[in-house]
């Protein structure tokens, strides 16, 4: 190999090219209607049903990506991927709400998330042809970089007006017990999800409609029509399967390598 060429860099470029190719392939398949059947996620079925009921009752559905932040420093929960998953779910739910005429109430605990929500939900209403129904006041910033203050603000929203349901996906920890228990006592159906090992047990205690771990990253594709979201989900599944196969293959190779006199794997 020529001097100055990094094997790791070449490998990463190949992975990126493969990922782009898979997204393009799956997007083309989705546009042709060739979508792989998805396993059911009851929590998202409950959210879909709540959006339909809210159009009839006139009660709002609360949407939230939590109090996760982007580019968090030490001492602040860094859950950028969870935040993005929550933002995408909120936008897809808002798009469905715009088509159904469902009132929504959106809250966040980070300035960046708040701006992203306002822009994304405005765009969702515009694409649904209901731009006149978008109300900026329905997208609220409750706090900034303070998880406990944020869930306290959500409980205030719960007590201020009747809600048809509340969907909260993002970075939640022990503070979720405050809002989860309050919602359960008020009889508000809650659809929740996180990857946090401290937040998940509390979610399972307060609501059966819980997305566990990586299920939150698939939520957008379950609510979105066929297209880019489906392509991203299928690509993630393929890459995840490939990583698992490589890990198992590497483990087996490392076990048999000393006995068969095979060359060691690079970097080991």
Report the location of each language-model feature.
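Hydrophobic alpha-helical transmembrane segments of small proteolipidic membrane proteins, enriched
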Residues: 2-42, 256-257
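Membrane-interface segments at loop-to-transmembrane junctions
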Residues: 38-47, 231-236
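Acidic, Ser/Thr-rich low-complexity segments on the non-lumenal side of membrane proteins
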Residues: 47-93
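Gly/Ser/Thr-rich loops at beta-strand to alpha-helix junctions
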Residues: 66-72, 83-84, 110-114, 169-176
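Long, charge-dense
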Residues: 96-98, 102-151
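Membrane-proximal low-complexity regions enriched in glycine and acidic/polar residues
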Residues: 128-186
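Extracytoplasmic/lumenal ectodomains and periplasmic regions of secretory and membrane proteins
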Residues: 165-214
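C-terminal functional extensions of proteins
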Residues: 198-200, 204-268
């Amino acid at each position: 190999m020529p001097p100055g060429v990094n094997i790791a860099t070449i490998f990463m470029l190949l992975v990126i090219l493969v990922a782009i190719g898979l997204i393009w392939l799956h997007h083309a398949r989705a546009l042709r209607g060739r979508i792989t059947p998805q396993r059911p996620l009851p929590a998202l079925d409950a959210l879909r049903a709540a959006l339909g009921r809210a159009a009839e009752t006139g009660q709002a559905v609360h949407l939230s990506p939590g109090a996760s932040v982007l580019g968090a420093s030490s001492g602040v929960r860094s859950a950028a991927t969870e935040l993005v998953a929550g933002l995408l779910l909120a936008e897809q739910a808002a798009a469905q709400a715009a088509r159904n005429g469902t009132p929504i109430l959106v809250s966040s605990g980070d300035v960046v998330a708040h701006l992203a929500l306002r822009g994304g939900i405005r765009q969702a209403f515009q694409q649904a042809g209901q731009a006149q129904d978008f109300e900026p006041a329905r997208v609220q910033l409750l706090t900034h970089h303070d998880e406990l203050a944020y869930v306290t603000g959500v409980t205030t929203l719960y007590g201020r007006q009747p809600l048809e349901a509340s969907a909260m996906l993002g970075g939640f920890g022990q503070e979720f017990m405050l809002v989860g228990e309050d919602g359960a006592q008020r009889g508000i159906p809650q659809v929740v999800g996180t990857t946090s090992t401290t937040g998940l047990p509390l979610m399972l205690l307060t609501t059966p409609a819980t997305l566990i771990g990586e299920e939150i990253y698939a939520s957008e594709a379950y609510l979105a029509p066929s297209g880019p979201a489906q392509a991203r989900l299928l690509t993630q599944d393929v890459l995840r399967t490939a990583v698992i196969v490589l890990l198992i293959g590497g483990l087996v190779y490392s076990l048999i390598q000393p006995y068969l006199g095979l060359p060691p794997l690079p970097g080991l």
